[in-house]
């Protein structure tokens, strides 16, 4: 018997075929686009190095919703629960502070062995892993400087941490058969008027060159660098600005990370993608939702998320853009936060794949901006939801909001027991 979903699917196929879109091909393309989920939503960026320590680096996780993960086993279980509710290919993005060891490990001494459980788990769940050195929430970052620190010994500590992190990243890629993107973000900056803005940037430039000096197989590891406008306590000066890292990534041919919350509120990273791609080999995206500042709210299916997805698809950047998420909301169920944000990113990618881009390009080239706008708006009403629901069914995930029932059941059975 034909189900309601199948009827809607058949009608959707016809509607999209009328504008030249093959929905089966769109779903095949969607399966080429993994989204890297960030582990730190699950525990408010606490990590396992010093879970009771305070979060520093000019970032904040606000809220106190019960049930956050307290160890790696709980975090992996929570991730599995979330991933069951998200269709299609996924990756996991880890920070160095999520290492596992029976004894304390200095950050400049981390090794692949401290992440072997994550690798075995990733293999079992058919996931790729990405990585980040953790240059925050540490006594040697307390004064607001790491890779650009004026003290040679402190700066060297962070250089060695990033070097060690690259080896961990390469281990991920070698073990899992898919390159790990390792992103370097540092909180370095000053609260008030800064007299010497040049010297810290000179030190950062030299430090980064030392960090990436060891040649690693690009099939296993990709270097990325990330800028930021400001952070709490670093409102007046950020060493790693957009101009600094754009220049660095261009001159060193690393990947450039664009975080949706790391620019002025009137700027959007969707407009930066095509410009950056002219100069850098690859991009890493941190899709987030800044509310007035880099607040890292859960990603919505809003105009900017859609614009980011459309830029990737319209310019066929599948093999040059790595899609990651970066938000941490401690005021709501953390598993639901993952599910909402990741599903929204995937919905945006699907909608972009269902766009009649070829026809729109023709109209634009012909100067018919009236028809361009009309088509862009009318396509929003095409039945993409039916295509999404079929995609979810094929991946054995809930199509609609019924996924929330599973989250609530898990919350009652598991999260509520954590105190």
From Swiss-Prot:
The top EC class is isomerase
Q: Which reaction does it catalyse?
A: L-rhamnopyranose = L-rhamnulose
Q: Which residues bind Mn(2+)?
A: 262, 294, 296
Q: Which GO terms describe its molecular function?
A: L-rhamnose isomerase activity; manganese ion binding
Instruction: Read off the InterPro entries from this record.
Output: L-rhamnose_isomerase, Rhamnose_isomerase, Xyl_isomerase-like_sf
- Function comment: Catalyzes the interconversion of L-rhamnose and L-rhamnulose.
What's in the GO CC field?
Answer: cytoplasm
Q: Where in the cell is it found?
A: Cytoplasm
Cystine pairs: none
* Source domain of life: Bacteria
Q: Which cofactor does it need?
A: Mn(2+)
GO terms in the biological process aspect are: L-lyxose metabolic process; rhamnose catabolic process
HAMAP family from the UniProt entry: RhaA
Q: What is this protein called?
A: L-rhamnose isomerase
Membrane-spanning segments: none
Report keywords, A-Z: Cytoplasm, Isomerase, Manganese, Metal-binding, Rhamnose metabolism
- Name the SUPFAM superfamilies for this protein: Xylose isomerase-like
Q: Describe its assembly.
A: Homotetramer.
Pfam families linked to this entry: RhaA
